[in-house]
């Protein structure tokens, strides 16, 4: 094999390792959604209270993403990733042996702390380690890894939880993370911090109206999604009256739609980023609005879940690339803010869904989410109408160099 070919294969192996890490981080972030009823039962708590682990996780990430990013802005990235994975593994082992609910909450806080840095630095790192002519495909592979978390991670985690208990699911996640740690140790080169930004970057970033609008949109639209999605498992069991196995299959379909969204993203995003994001938001709004109606029949629930997944995955892909586009000079700081705001949305959505359940009933979580989504859709249109001329639709060559 020629040295060039060997180097290229090693670069692809690094990208795939990041995609695998994305799979594990996304799986563990959302696995409580699939195990919520089992966790509640094991601690003799109502589901609405157990949902606190989703809210706490999200808010820890939202509060710590930017401070931790700034504290580690100059840290060498390979060593930082290895240290993060050590804490990630130890936190999952604590989840396995958690003797009461609050110990589990503490363990999830540990995982959330690793999350707060991992997603702040990963998008720019995967571009750096990829072959020079395959940087956009590298982001696509990372997105596929995240989508596979929904396709395989959540359904398999749920199945493992059903047969062996929810603790076994966390134990297996820890084992996979050990494998990823070894791969990072073997494959990654020395990675000095690059274009991370600093505290001085904040005033500059906050003078960019398109970026600020994107952050506001992120909080609103993610809140809309998680108002319903945080409680989709009890919704399917109690409102759709599905069996446990059928509910697991619906989660599989939801995840499968993420692959479809990734393919659509690669095909259409560059031709019209704003149109792509608008389409995805419209799809999310429609599916949330129709959630209760679709729940009356199993086949309509499957169909709606598939389109719902395309909508939210398309939004996530589009917004992440848009952040990199609008802040190529401070990618890690901009992504840390994005990750923090995204998780504010998750926590707010889970909390709002909890309140809707308690005051109006589980059946109305979709309608409540749709109202938020409409607000986000209107905000996005207004911001683009007023400030859209300030940014080109495609990354310039110079911006690509800065991102890479």
Swiss-Prot record:
Q: How does it sit in the membrane?
A: Multi-pass membrane protein
What positions belong to coiled-coil segments?
none
The transmembrane segments are: 15-35, 51-71, 85-105, 109-129, 137-157, 168-188, 209-229, 245-265, 276-296, 299-319, 333-353, 363-383
Q: GO molecular function terms here? A: carbohydrate transmembrane transporter activity
A Gene Ontology cellular-component term: plasma membrane
Q: Where in the cell is it found?
A: Cell inner membrane
| Keyword DNA-binding set for record | no
Q: Give the chief site where it resides.
A: membrane
**UniProt xrefs under SUPFAM superfamilies:** MFS general substrate transporter (SSF103473)
Q: What domain of life does the UniProt record list for this protein's source?
A: Bacteria
The alphabetical list of record keywords is:
Cell inner membrane, Cell membrane, Membrane, Sugar transport, Transmembrane, Transmembrane helix, Transport
Q: Which PANTHER family match?
A: PURINE EFFLUX PUMP PBUE, SUGAR EFFLUX TRANSPORTER
Q: Which HAMAP family match?
A: MFS_SotB
Relate the protein's function as given in its record: Involved in the efflux of sugars. The physiological role may be the reduction of the intracellular concentration of toxic sugars or sugar metabolites.
Q: Which family does it belong to?
A: Belongs to the major facilitator superfamily. SotB (TC 2.A.1.2) family.
This protein's name? Probable sugar efflux transporter
The organism named in the record is: Pasteurella multocida (strain Pm70)
| Gene this chain is encoded by | sotB
């Amino acid at each position: 094999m020629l040295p060039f070919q060997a180097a290229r294969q090693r670069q692809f192996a690094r990208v795939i390792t990041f995609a695998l890490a994305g799979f594990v981080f996304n799986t563990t972030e959302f696995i409580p959604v699939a195990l919520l009823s089992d966790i509640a039962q094991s601690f003799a708590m109502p589901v609405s209270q157990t949902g606190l682990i989703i809210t706490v996780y999200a808010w820890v990430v939202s509060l710590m993403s930017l401070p931790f990013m700034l504290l580690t802005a100059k840290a060498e990235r390979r060593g930082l990733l290895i240290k993060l994975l050590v804490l990630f593994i130890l936190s999952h082992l604590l989840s396995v042996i958690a003797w009461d609910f609050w110990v589990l909450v503490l363990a999830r806080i540990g995982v959330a702390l690793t999350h707060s840095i991992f997603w702040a630095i990963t998008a720019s790192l995967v571009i750096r380690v990829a072959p020079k002519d395959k940087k956009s495909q590298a982001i696509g592979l990372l997105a596929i890894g995240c989508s596979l978390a929904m396709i395989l991670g959540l359904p398999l985690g749920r199945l493992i939880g059903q047969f062996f208990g929810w603790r076994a699911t966390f134990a297996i996640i820890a084992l996979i993370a050990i494998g990823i740690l070894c791969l990072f140790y073997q494959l990654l080169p020395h990675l000095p911090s690059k274009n991370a930004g600093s505290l001085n970057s904040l005033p500059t970033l906050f003078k960019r109206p398109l970026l600020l609008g994107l952050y506001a949109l992120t909080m609103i639209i993610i809140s809309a999604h998680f108002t319903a999605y945080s409680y989709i498992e009890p919704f399917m069991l109690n409102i759709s009256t599905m069996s446990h196995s059928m509910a697991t299959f619906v989660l599989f379909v939801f995840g499968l739609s993420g692959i479809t969204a990734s393919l659509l993203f690669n095909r259409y995003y560059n031709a019209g980023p704003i149109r792509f994001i608008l389409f995805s938001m419209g799809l999310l709004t429609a599916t949330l609005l129709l959630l209760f109606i679709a729940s009356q029949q199993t086949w309509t629930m499957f169909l709606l879940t598939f389109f719902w997944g395309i909508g939210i995955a398309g939004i996530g892909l589009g917004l992440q690339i848009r952040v990199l586009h609008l802040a190529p000079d401070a990618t890690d700081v901009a992504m840390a803010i994005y990750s923090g705001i995204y998780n504010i949305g998750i926590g707010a959505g889970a909390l709002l869904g909890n309140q809707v359940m308690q005051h109006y009933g589980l059946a109305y979580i979709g309608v409540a989410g749709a109202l938020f989504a409409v607000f986000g859709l209107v905000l996005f249109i207004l911001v683009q109408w007023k400030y859209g001329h300030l940014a080109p639709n495609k990354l310039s060559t110079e911006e690509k160099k800065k991102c890479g």
